[in-house]
From Swiss-Prot:
It holds the Pfam family tRNA-synt_1c. Residues 176-205 are annotated as: Disordered. It comes from Arabidopsis thaliana (Mouse-ear cress). GO terms for molecular function: ATP binding; glutamate-tRNA ligase activity. This is Glutamate--tRNA ligase, cytoplasmic. Residues 195-204 have a biased composition (Basic and acidic residues). Keywords: Aminoacyl-tRNA synthetase, ATP-binding, Cytoplasm, Ligase, Nucleotide-binding, Protein biosynthesis. Belongs to the class-I aminoacyl-tRNA synthetase family. Glutamate--tRNA ligase type 2 subfamily. Interacts with GLN2, COL4 and RPP13L4/ZAR1. PROSITE patterns: AA_TRNA_LIGASE_I. Catalyzes the attachment of glutamate to tRNA(Glu) in a two-step reaction: glutamate is first activated by ATP to form Glu-AMP and then transferred to the acceptor end of tRNA(Glu).
Length: 719
């Protein structure tokens, strides 16, 4: 494609062609100054031309070197792609728009991509057609009307966010209902919505936000692993940064050496990466300790802060009762003298703290002289023993936000009463104000999000660690089998809502099921205990192997080798449900008729005998049974199910977690699995037929060591 130029009129850019060129990193010069009556065209260096958006799109599909399957890898796929490329034009017809959405939505219920198993120009054509309608699609996208279509659209946007957001910002005018080329003047390039009053602003979202000027921060304290509540804050920052073409920085709020460690820092960075968050840089509040100390001293000199040696319990009581501290009117000299004692970490200094001088009678108790600095002689995980004093979150956070150029600080609504304090601190410091934007904290039933309480479970040995699959940490839920795509969709569906409802887990697991079910391989397992041998008297004298799909609707899952033998294993529960003379269906084989049932003295089934009836109709049988061949190639499995760690839907602040510990949170069942499961890798997600979805936690090592599979909830039960 070297030396090629894309030419089109400024009022009608071929969005699908531009997207395809951008995704495939194809070298091309863009000229958006063609006459209004012309069609998009490729002009080659030798003077040859191709005309028309669909022709150009197909050319990109065929010639994209970095995406070899962009136009399919066989004639059938390429023909299907042609169908979708032609169909994309329907979305530009106002009367047919929703009918088209409905058709594609239904098709995507069982497909990840429109054609084949990877992104193609079929996806590009439909995706661009939707994106190009602007506000009409955005409104539907926020609704729950076309969930499969929205999932597909969002997954493509998430996967190629940097490229696609750039294209959308340049060529899609929100609210206009059609693509337009970006205006050439610098000022007008910021006008995304298109009317003069809303220049630089997308749809109502962050207050006073301008395209390209938004700077956000995600500021976790390194005192634990990232959990699902933190993930909501992190992903909302990511979402707004992408929406406004801004940036996110990660800042570790490392102001409490008693709780923090490098282990937590390392794992937080790992988890942020798992969430797919791209950040400009990593900073630490401790980077600003010298400046924070200077600011505290400045406020004392200006009479806006003082040193207080009131005992902590008395100080809390005075704050509740609105009583001024006896130290409130200390002279500047006395405050600075005690401040030096605090810096030195002396015995006298350890009795003191620094407080802001606000209003002790303010109805909002957060405004009653908040603490700015405390002594803490413990070693800091990053800077060692350099400091004996540390700023509080309430003092350090607004200072560093302003200093780092943060335009909008996202905070959960639990901080609402401290918003006025945040603004007052910045006012007293004489620093630039920062916009605060609230969202509701994520509350889930039977779930602890307090790092202190989670740490208690770790320290008592009730869980295996911070990545325990019963934990709500990112590492824990991923280990349980949750796909990050599901978590992102779940959180963004809630948006920045301030609703504080207690949520069930089943919605999240239902989203996860929609993602894994269309693609995960199918395997077979039989519970080992009391399994029953079913002898087929006319079965094969010699075992034979047949290759069958691991997923009947998804070729990409591959094939598995299934062995057929004269005797097969059934689970006791299945064997006990069969009557003599009953015809049953053996899945992936055919029908069989049970002729004889053997039971022990307690009435338990111990053996079955019967004959094959492969011509029998599977529609007429009541029982469709999973089975395994009687061979020594089967693998040992440990199937692990989990329950909630606590027995109360929501713990109150004064509840002791030890009083509500669930004593039975883990159930292990030994089973046998088909031989193909030897190839499972840690993290693979599969479906065991008639049992559910599982994630491989420990893969096959040797015959004596079972493969460990973790059960993945599917949304039907809140587990």
């Amino acid at each position: 494609m070297d030396g090629m130029k894309l030419s089109f009129p400024p009022e009608s850019p071929p969005l699908s062609v531009i997207v395809a060129l951008s995704l495939s990193a194809s070298p091309v010069t863009i000229d958006s100054s063609a006459a209004a009556t012309t069609v998009p065209s490729f002009v080659f260096s030798d003077g040859r031309k191709l005309n028309g958006a669909t022709v150009l799109l197909r050319y990109v599909g065929r010639s994209a070197k970095k995406l070899p399957d962009f136009y399919g890898n066989n004639a059938f796929d390429s023909s299907q792609i042609d169908e979708w490329v032609d169909y994309a034009s329907v979305f530009s017809s106002g009367s047919e728009f929703e009918n088209a959405c409905g058709r594609v939505d239904k098709y995507l219920e069982s497909s990840t991509f429109l054609v084949g198993h990877s992104l193609s120009i079929a996806d590009v054509a439909i995706w661009s057609a939707l994106a190009g309608t602007g506000q009409r699609w955005e409104s539907l996208r926020k609704s729950k009307k076309y969930q499969s279509l929205v999932r597909w659209f969002n997954s493509i946007l998430d996967e190629y966010s940097e490229v696609l957001n750039k294209v959308l910002a340049t060529y899609v005018k929100k609210g206009s209902g059609k693509p337009v080329a970006a205006p050439k003047s610098k000022d007008s390039q910021q006008a995304v919505k298109g009317d003069g009053q809303d220049k630089g602003k997308p749809e109502v979202d962050l207050p006073e936000a301008e395209i390209g000027k938004v700077k956000l921060r995600f500021a976790p304290e390194p005192s634990g692993y990232l959990h699902i509540g933190h993930a909501k804050a992190a992903l909302l920052n990511k979402y707004f940064a992408e929406r406004y073409q801004g940036e996110v920085i990660v800042r570790f709020d490392d102001t409490n050496p008693a709780k923090e460690s490098n282990e937590f820092v390392d794992n937080l960075v790992k988890d942020i990466g798992t969430l797919g968050i791209k950040y400009e840089k990593v900073t630490y509040t401790s980077d600003y300790f010298p400046e924070l100390m200077d600011m505290a001293e400045k406020l004392m000199r200006e009479g806006k802060a003082y040193v207080d040696d009131t005992p902590r319990e008395q100080m809390q009581k005075e704050r509740m009762d609105g009583i001024d501290s006896k130290c409130r009117n200390h002279s500047v000299e006395e405050n600075l003298k005690l401040w030096k004692e605090m810096i030195a970490g002396s015995e006298r200094g350890l009795q003191c703290c620094v407080r802001g001088k606000f209003n002790m009678q303010d109805p909002n108790k957060a405004m009653r002289d908040p603490v700015y600095y405390r002594c803490n002689p413990m070693s800091h995980h990053r800077i060692g023993d350099k400091y004996k004093i540390y700023p509080t979150y309430d003092f350090a956070c607004p200072f560093v936000d302003s200093l780092e150029g943060i335009t909008h600080a996202l905070r959960s609504s639990e901080y609402h009463d401290r918003n006025a304090q945040y603004f007052k601190v910045l006012e007293d410091m004489g620093l630039r104000q920062v916009q605060l934007y609230e969202f509701s904290r994520l509350n889930l039933v039977f779930t602890l999000l307090s790092k202190r309480k989670l740490l208690w479970f770790v320290q008592t040995g009730l869980v295996d660690g911070w990545d325990d699959p019963r934990f709500p940490t990112v590492q824990g839920i991923v280990r349980r089998g949750l796909k990050i795509e599901a978590l992102i969709q779940f959180i963004l569906e809630q948006g920045a809502s301030k609703n504080l409802n207690l949520m069930e887990w089943d919605k999240l697991w239902s989203i996860n099921k929609r993602i894994i079910d269309p693609v995960c391989p199918r395997h077979t397992a039989v519970v080992a205990e009391r399994r029953v041998l079913f002898t087929l008297t006319d079965g094969p004298d010699e075992p034979f192997v047949r290759m069958i799909p691991k997923h009947k609707k998804f070729e990409g899952a591959g094939e598995k080798a299934t062995t057929f033998t004269k005797s097969i294993w059934l689970e006791e529960a299945d064997a006990s449900a069969i009557s003599v003379g009953e015809e049953v269906t053996l899945m992936d084989w055919g029908n069989a008729i049970v002729k004889e049932i053997t039971k022990d003295e307690e009435g338990r089934v111990t053996a079955l005998s019967g004959v094959l009836n492969l011509q029998g109709s599977v529609k007429t049988t009541k029982l469709k049974l999973t089975w395994l061949p009687d061979t020594n190639e089967l693998v040992n499995l440990t199937l692990t199910e989990f329950d909630y760690l606590i027995t109360k839907k929501k713990l109150e602040d004064d509840d002791e977690v030890a009083d509500f510990v669930n004593p039975n949170t883990k159930k292990e069942t030994l089973a046998l699995g088909d031989s193909n499961m030897r190839n499972l890798k840690c993290g693979d997600v599969i479906q065991l037929e008639r049992k559910g979805y599982f994630r491989c936690d420990v893969p096959f090592v040797k015959s004596s060591k079972p493969i460990v599979l973790f059960s993945i909830p599917d949304g039907r039960a809140a587990k």
